[in-house]
Amino acid sequence: MHLIGEQGVGILLLVVLALQGGAMFACTGRFLQIKPEGQNIVMMENCFNTAILILFIPLIAVSLIIGWYQILDLTHLAIAIPWLIYGLEAIGIALIICGTAMVVFGFLALRNTFQPGGFAPRSQDSLVTWGIYSLVRNPLNAGVLSVTLGLALVVQSLFVIALSIIYLIMVLRVLSIEENQLSEAFAEEYRSYSQKAKRLVPFIY
């Protein structure tokens, strides 16, 4: 890690967690929910998402700050090409920053309509289509994916890459459930919105 050093990356990750946590607590919707019957993939995705944010990323951040990361991560890739290292780190840092912005603005836009992924809209909920939601329909998932992938590029870790892939698979499964729920709850309004805003990657997908 040459661009900002291991301690710099660790501090960046702690700032990311602080911003995301602050935005989440500013959101007035319910967070804890009863597990919906027959939706095991929903519970798995929510637990995995929580583990990434409150376990994996903090542990990686602390190990980077105290200089233990490369000792603890046996899947670290020892890349010997300087320009490739700098390129991966630059792209990774950009993804971390962009992903954090998506999560923060996503929480702030949702506020009291927020629910964990895979839960059907409540009767008092309205469809949020403004702010970051005008660009992408799932900024919270997209943001966490972006942060995780960015971290994998910065630390060059097969373990973190595997986390990103597993999380992506879970997210895609849960998004199919969510989209059906939103389509039933908001009918034509959601179908029209889904034609304007991308699913996960602004302007692309």
Question: What spans do the regions from the language model cover?
Answer:
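Membrane-interface loop-to-helix entry segments
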Residues: 129-145
